[in-house]
Amino acid sequence: MAEPAGSNAGEPPVIELRNVSKSFGEVRSLSGVNFKVNRREIVGLLGDNGSGKSTLVKVVMGFHTPDPGGEIYFHGKRMDEWSVAKARSLGIETVYQERALCEKQPIWRNMFMGRELRTRLGLLDVNRMRAEAARLMREHMGFTSAAVHPSNVVATMSGGEKQGVAITRALYFEAELVILDEPTMGLSLSETKKTLDFVRNIKEVGKSAIFIDHNIFNVYPVVDRLYVLDRGKVAGVYNRSEITMDALIERLYHVARTGTLE
């Protein structure tokens, strides 16, 4: 299969899982999974409940370590130690479906929560954070301060705009890889469109993303490649440019019915 559009010749993937399995007692959630995300690539992750999507993503996030024999590589370097702290220190950020924003706080405070900018004296640099928030909203979200001011309370924003804040926050802190955990759940059609535009922007600024969603109609238009998981195994990997949505839906249906691509 040809290299995906997001790949860069000669560059190792941002993250790569090789032969990763994960068991919990007698239950095997992942079995021999090979998975990678290249720089400037958006990778979709599809599969029914129980297919292994959540476990795979939690391995990438550092919540789970692979069973013996599985390996994780970051920019081509094998990771002998893997944890949430390690993954985050390398620039792996997650945008959850709940968005993890403080509704009663202003936009600028949400963008810098836990990583506040400070003056040389160690005081909170409120003016700088407001100015940076305005710049980020303009560059990443397409908002002018006249339309949506950084001092506006998050609760006044739409669902799609809130996802934009969460994604922009991740990008500001030099995220190499943004994990999007069903970011369109519960959103209207118009807000879903806004969110998908924010997802596309991740690639435009040179970063990568994993997009998890149950809705193929949301995933297909924005990804470069798609992994289909079934019962803990990779049932298929597709370049979007090489498969139509109708053909992909047929294959997903076949996998769900038979557990194979044959």
Model-flagged regions — what are they?
Residues 2-262:
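Glycine-rich phosphate-binding loops of nucleotide-dependent enzymes
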